[in-house]
Amino acid sequence: MVTVKFKYKGEEKEVDTSKIKKVWRVGKMISFTYDEGGGKTGRGAVSEKDAPKELLQMLEKQKK
């Protein structure tokens, strides 16, 4: 399992790619939503160059 490390509101976070629900591109950033548990949805973003290949593959799959 691959984890994505990112900063959100100044806080370092990481999330497993299996929890990511939706992925989209905003300029040179890859944004995503993920399941935080307890019915909560979290948001995050990572630069395209720092994104793991699994996250980029998820982005390509959602485009189709």
UniProtKB/Swiss-Prot annotation:
Domain of life according to the entry: Archaea
Keywords: Cytoplasm, DNA-binding, Methylation
Modifications made to the protein after synthesis: Lys-5 and Lys-7 may be methylated.
Keyword set includes Cytoplasm: yes
GO MF entries: DNA binding; RNA endonuclease activity
Summary of subunit composition and partner proteins: Monomer.
Protein's name according to its UniProt entry: DNA-binding protein 7b
